[in-house]
Every structure is written in structure tokens, then in C-alpha cells.
Amino acid sequence: MARKKITLVGAGNIGGTLAHLALIKQLGDVVLFDIAQGMPNGKALDLLQTCPIEGVDFKVRGTNDYKDLENSDVVIVTAGVPRKPGMSRDDLLGINIKVMQTVGEGIKHNCPNAFVICITNPLDIMVNMLQKFSGVPDNKIVGMAGVLDSARFRTFLADELNVSVQQVQAYVMGGHGDTMVPLTKMSNVAGVSLEQLVKEGKLKQERLDAIVSRTRSGGGEIVALLKTGSAYYAPAAAGIQMAESFLKDKKMILPCAAKVKAGMYGLDEDLFVGVPTEISANGVRPIEVEISDKEREQLQVSINAVKDLNKVAAEILAK
């Protein structure tokens, strides 16, 4: 059986971490693409030299040529300008649209059948732009957002309750920004809902509210601490989990920015936004789950925020 090919467009902190995780998990051969001369090649050589130590036997190479995307099974896109202190995801819009155009055309001409995962921010708009320029069908392109946001939610809950994070199931829907919706109703600890934990006095409502707020600003918290960049370990781990579900046909249900059809969650148009999504060898399939009236209202606010940014993106493209 031929080995799978995973191409990482953008060889920065997230791209390099993605490559390392892909090797450790033995997902396939790795190509690191970046426009910076020498940098992807240097990282690829460094990563290749970890293979004897890790006990894996895969190829890793760096490139500046979009032709090397040819026959990729998975393409994970992190290219773009990263967030800086005081910069919102939305500030990145104009710059990164141009990046998505270049990357999208590279995918279109070299690997139109690849499964594409977008990580570039502002996420919900960038995955929309990437599809526009690449022509990849709805079921073969998705944005990495909810897996990361949910991981942050789970981490904060586990820390607050002093339990194993593996016992915490928590989900976040909506746009990958300040309007995201951590689902307190369907989230649980070892099967016990957060609402029940609050009723039993094991979790104070004000602490839960603080955790929800911290989850929404989780990315910004890390940006403020790092001062010179943004998160990359957890975003890379999230992207690899999604890629692995596709490559191994795991059919995992993960919160992702998938193309949600009009009619689902009250949408009046097709829209990339974070919802529970099955990822299999056939690609992505958004799933509608029951949420509370309050969460539905919050989700609508988030949907409107994504739609507003899409309008701004359309105006930028029209100039």
C-alpha cells in the first residue's frame, strides 16, 4: 500500500509541530511548504533526523514550489500573518485573504482531490476564502477551530474540578472568536452534566461563567503571554486529530468549521461555522444536535458575526 502524503502549507511554529506530530503518529510522508527560502528545507531535514530516534521510517522534505503539493492526500494550511499582541483575528482579514488566494490556486492546480484543513485566522472566513479559490468540494474542506476551543474548555474545567481531562467531554460551537458558544448543557464530567454539578454545588455558577469567558479569550490569553506569536502546540494537535480521522476513516465527531447547509441550526444560507462534524474517509458531514434556547440565541449571534465578516471579505475582494 502506498504511503499517504501530508502537505503542510506554512512551515512556521504550527506547521513544524504538525509535521512532527504527523511523523510520530506515522500518518504518512510529509512535505513542508513555505515561501521563505531555506526555512522549510532546514526544518524538514531536522525532522527527518528525528525518525531514527522516534523509530519511524517516513520521508520529510521542504519546498518553495507549489508543484510539490501534487498527489497530496491531506493539505493543512497554516500560511498567513499570525496574531500579535493587541491584534484581533478580524484585523488579519485583508492580509490573509490574499494568502488564501495564492494557496487556494496552488491546491486547485496541484491537488484538487486532497482533504483540506484550514487553520489560518480569522478561521471561519479564511476557510470560506480557501474554498472559493481552490474549488475543493464542501465535503473535502474544513476549518480547525472547535477542536481547539473545546480542548481549552475541557482543560479549564478539568483544572477547576481537579479531575482527569479525559473524563471531561465539552464542546464549543460557532465562530472561532469572541462569540464562540461553549455548550454547557451537553458538556459533562464522567457523564454528569455541568448543570447537575452546579445544582449539587460541586461547581459554582460564577466559576463556570468565568471558565466560559476564559475559553472565549483562550487564544488571546496565550498571545498576550507569548508577546511574539500565538499558540501552536494545541492548534497543531487539533489539526492532526482531524487529519487522522480522515486518513484512518475513524468517523470521529469533532467540532469543526464545516460548510453547514441552509436550514441547519436556523441558517438562511450555506455557511462555514463551527458545529459537530463527522470526519471520515468520505470527508466531513455536519451534524445537528439539540442545544438549549439560550445556546441557540448565542449561536445566532456568532453566526451573524461570521456573516458580517464574510461581507467585509466580499467587499475587499470587490475592490
Curated annotation (Swiss-Prot):
InterPro entries: L-lactate/malate_DH (IPR001557), Lactate/malate_DH_C (IPR022383), Lactate/malate_DH_N (IPR001236), Lactate_DH/Glyco_Ohase_4_C (IPR015955), Malate_DH_type3 (IPR011275), NAD(P)-bd_dom_sf (IPR036291). Keywords: NAD, Oxidoreductase, Tricarboxylic acid cycle. The active site is at residue 176. It catalyses: (S)-malate + NAD(+) = oxaloacetate + NADH + H(+). The keyword Transmembrane does not apply. NAD(+) binds at residues 10-15, 34, 96, 119-121. It comes from the Bacteria. Pfam families: Ldh_1_C, Ldh_1_N. One of its GO terms (biological process) is tricarboxylic acid cycle. CDD domains: LDH-like_MDH. Substrate binds at residues 83, 89, 121, 152. It is an enzyme of class 1 (oxidoreductase). SUPFAM superfamilies: LDH C-terminal domain-like (SSF56327), NAD(P)-binding Rossmann-fold domains (SSF51735). GO terms for molecular function: L-lactate dehydrogenase activity; L-malate dehydrogenase (NAD+) activity. Its EC number is 1.1.1.37. Belongs to the LDH/MDH superfamily. MDH type 3 family. Catalyzes the reversible oxidation of malate to oxaloacetate. This is Malate dehydrogenase.
